Amino acid sequence: MEMEMSVLAMSSTLILALAMALIFLFKAKSSSAIKWPPGPKTLPIIGNLHQLGGDELHIVLAKLARVHGAIMTIWMAKKPVIVVSDVNSVWEVLVSKSSDYAARDAAEISKIVSASSHSINTSDSGPYWQTLRRGLTHGPLGPLNISAQIPIQQRDMQRVIREMQQDAAANGGIIKPLDHLKRSSTRLVSRLIFGDTFDNDPYNDSMHEVVQDLNRFGGIALLEQAFSFAKHLPSYKRGVKEFHIHKRKIDDLVRPVVASANPPSNSYLGFLQSQNYSEEIIIACIFELYLLAMDSSASTATWALAFMIRDQQVQEKLYQDIKRVIGDGVDLVKAEDLSKMHYLQAVVKETMRMKPIAPLAIPHKTAIDTTVMGTKVPKGTCVMVNLYALHHDESVWAKPYTFMPERFLQGEDGKSVTEQAFLPFGAGMRICGGMEVGKLQFSLALANLVNAFKWTSAAEGKLPDMSDELQFITVMKTPLEARIIPRNP
């Protein structure tokens, strides 16, 4: 009897394994029947995964595109991913056929903190997404509300400068600017969510820590998307456990603030509550705004400082541009001054070109059967837009790997650069809704920091490491440390 049961169990296992193999082969055959764009040669089971190591993913894909074409197929195990990298293909995906590519290819693990893909960046396009985006861009991120934030943000920059001075005094003149800028960004995001009068440093500090912790697990989502069987791996299971732990931290942090708030109608919370969304969706939407906005302008400003530490001539030209507009002895650069600072705007653009905050954007998915540059793309296909490759295209940009703000000045080499090749915030239907506030925050921070301090290397002769690390956004692999010298002691 026991032998019969053993044989039966073995037979069942073999039948199950055979069935799974047949399903895999059927799917593989179905995929192979489609004429996908060309790409690097694959290996069984893993596809192209063995070719995606070494550098950060956006850099690896840019190198592969130079060999295999601006429209190529990368196989994440058995999953095809189309990567577009030049002006024409990127513009077709993001703008010309924006609605065709407006769905999202969200990882299952991301649903833990996004209320099952009910946040603005994880949900597919449709009536729900349109309502959510309209509420965000017409309310907290609308021009009237952003204008109201300007005097508050200017005062906050004065606070940042004071705290940097105190930090430097206690540490031999050396600071880590990213920490200060992140805290400023967190305060701004909190005001956009809860209203102008929101002022709660303990809450903001806790949110800052939660976002930093969660950023470390961005690679788990990629692992899941690459391997369908990743869910059975110990590392993935640990990642899921961490996501659930952070979800509880987020809930415990945000829930009491939401419950006690009386938000104005132009705040994000005011809009979310007006739609009668569930508490889970409200908390997910709030946290997403922190996750996407808290690090973006702060990290970009830090990249700019690193570039100018490496090139002191650029820093001096920017300082003189600031002085030309506001004069000597003025401690605060105001938002109204920024548009007059032409070299500042060039530095801002060149930083975003060199180090786009989301170099692969957020992965798109085809909502219908469509085409890209004449090639058929089936519904449900994941499409990555390599903004890093676009911003470093040698057919568009002179010396693309050199930091040259002058390329964006009128009459200089960059005068004829097409706007279609410079897309730091994406384009089309799913362009970043926080684009205007992000540019304002970055420009205001950079102008005030260069006006207040001269920025040099923390250790003489040791320049900042400009290596990328791709988390949810692109950050410096080695966080910047700098020596600051007050310009107006």
UniProtKB/Swiss-Prot annotation:
Membrane topology label: Single-pass membrane protein
Chloroplast keyword on record: no
Sample GO molecular function, one term: heme binding
A Pfam family it matches: p450
Positions annotated to bind heme: 432
The reaction(s) this protein catalyses: (-)-matairesinol + reduced [NADPH--hemoprotein reductase] + O2 = (-)-pluviatolide + oxidized [NADPH--hemoprotein reductase] + 2 H2O + H(+)
Keyword tags: Heme, Iron, Membrane, Metal-binding, Oxidoreductase, Transmembrane, Transmembrane helix
Residues that span the membrane, as ranges: 6-26
Pathway(s) it belongs to: Aromatic compound metabolism; phenylpropanoid biosynthesis
Gene3D superfamilies (UniProt xref): Cytochrome P450 (1.10.630.10)
Induction: Transiently induced after wounding.
Entry EC number(s): 1.14.19.72
Tissue: Expressed in leaves, rhizomes and stems.
Gene Ontology annotations of biological process type: phenylpropanoid biosynthetic process; response to wounding
Uses: Combinatorially expression of Sinopodophyllum hexandrum (mayapple) genes of the podophyllotoxin pathway (e.g. DIR, PLR, SDH, CYP719A23, OMT3, CYP71CU1, OMT1, 2-ODD, CYP71BE54 and CYP82D61) in Nicotiana benthamiana (tobacco) results in the production of the chemotherapeutic compound etoposide.
Entry-linked PANTHER family: CYTOCHROME P450 98A9, OS09G0441700 PROTEIN
Protein task: Cytochrome P450 involved in the biosynthesis of etoposide, a chemotherapeutic compound of the topoisomerase inhibitor family. Catalyzes the conversion of matairesinol to pluviatolide.
Similarity comment: family membership: Belongs to the cytochrome P450 family.
Protein name per the record: Pluviatolide synthase
Organism expressing this protein natively: Sinopodophyllum hexandrum
Organism taxonomic ancestry: Eukaryota, Viridiplantae, Streptophyta, Embryophyta, Tracheophyta
Gene encoding the protein: CYP719A23
